[in-house]
């Protein structure tokens, strides 16, 4: 399975073995409307993919991986690591550094990270941004209201594992015909291919991740109405969402879903918020308007 060095909230990597059998053999084209890192579509059996997101930063990152050889991406990262003095466990081994309990490598990387963050906010480049994501807390991609990157330093560095993910992820862009677009999900330009399967993984109305903060009930309604219109046109769709989370229920989604096919997915969310040490159960679903699936089949 292809994984990504980019950590987007709601990343579907752990659910791919459950999701992909439902999406497989539906079309040779997938339109990934809220693509994030694009893991679902990149792992699909579709030869043609449209990666769409309304976030211009996401689009810039996707284009970087699509248009830059993997070795160049890694070399660019190595130069930043050297120039700023970040830890390099791939080169030196973790034993070279004395990790503090609960802090990992953060004490070594705090000053280099803050220097890089300052330089990026003055003169942004995609190479600097990728380094900030790797060395930032939980690999978050977050900006404040002034457009400045404002994630604190993280606990890990550009490890051997992350280098492998970088290489695999970048090379996956060369194995399919990929178009990258930057439209709002309501934009009709996205829905011109009646033979494609459309995959939606929007922000979740009832979860508390910062990514979901700007998503309102009106957005949820607009999306569900759009899906109904696609269904009337005979266009296949699959929607990832959450129906219950931390005592909250998306009643409108549950009622709407009764018209379609609902697959319940098994995932336990390990809450990474340092203020909460618990594992929370979110009832995540995949909703489709087609039935031609062999659910539960082995998928690799």
What are these regions (language model features)?
Residues 188-192:
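Short conserved loop adjoining the S-adenosyl-L-methionine
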Residues 150-156, 204-222:
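Mobile active-site "lid"/loop adjacent to the S-adenosyl-L-methionine
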Residues 217-300:
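Long, positively charged, glycine-interspersed low-complexity recognition regions
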Residues 182-187:
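Conserved SAM/SAH-binding loop
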Residues 28, 49, 197:
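Hydrophobic "anchor" residues on beta-strands that sit immediately upstream
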Residues 1-34, 39-40, 44:
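S-adenosyl-L-methionine
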Residues 47-175, 293:
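Class I S-adenosyl-L-methionine-dependent methyltransferase module
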């Amino acid at each position: 399975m292809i994984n990504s060095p980019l950590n987007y909230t709601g990343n579907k990597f752990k659910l791919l073995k459950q999701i992909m059998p439902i999406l497989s053999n539906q079309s040779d084209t997938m339109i990934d409307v809220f693509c994030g890192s694009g893991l679902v579509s990149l792992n699909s059996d579709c030869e043609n993919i449209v990666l769409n997101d309304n976030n211009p930063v996401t689009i810039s990152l996707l284009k970087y991986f699509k248009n830059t050889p993997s070795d160049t991406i890694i070399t660019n990262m190595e130069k930043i690591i050297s120039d700023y003095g970040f830890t390099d466990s791939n080169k030196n081994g973790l034993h070279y550094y004395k990790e503090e309990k609960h802090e990992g490598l953060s004490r070594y990387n705090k000053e280099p990270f803050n220097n890089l963050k300052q330089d990026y906010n003055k003169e942004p480049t995609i190479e600097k941004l990728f380094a900030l994501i790797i060395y930032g807390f939980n690999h978050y991609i977050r900006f404040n209201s002034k457009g400045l990157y404002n994630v604190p330093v993280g606990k890990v560095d550009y490890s051997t594992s992350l280098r492998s993910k970088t290489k695999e992820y970048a090379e996956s862009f060369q194995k399919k015909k990929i178009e990258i677009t930057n439209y709002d999900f309501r934009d009709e330009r996205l829905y011109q291919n009646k033979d494609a399967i459309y995959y939606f993984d929007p922000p979740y109305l009832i979860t508390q991740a910062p990514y979901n903060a700007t998503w309102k009930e009106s957005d949820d309604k607009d999306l569900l109405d759009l899906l109904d219109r696609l269904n009337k046109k005979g266009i296949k769709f699959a929607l990832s969402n959450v129906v219950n989370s931390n005592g909250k229920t998306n009643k409108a989604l549950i009622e709407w879903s009764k018209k379609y096919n609902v697959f319940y997915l098994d995932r336990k969310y390990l809450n990474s918020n340092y203020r909460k040490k618990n594992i929370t159960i979110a009832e995540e679903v995949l909703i489709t308007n087609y039935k031609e699936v062999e659910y539960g089949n082995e998928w690799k």
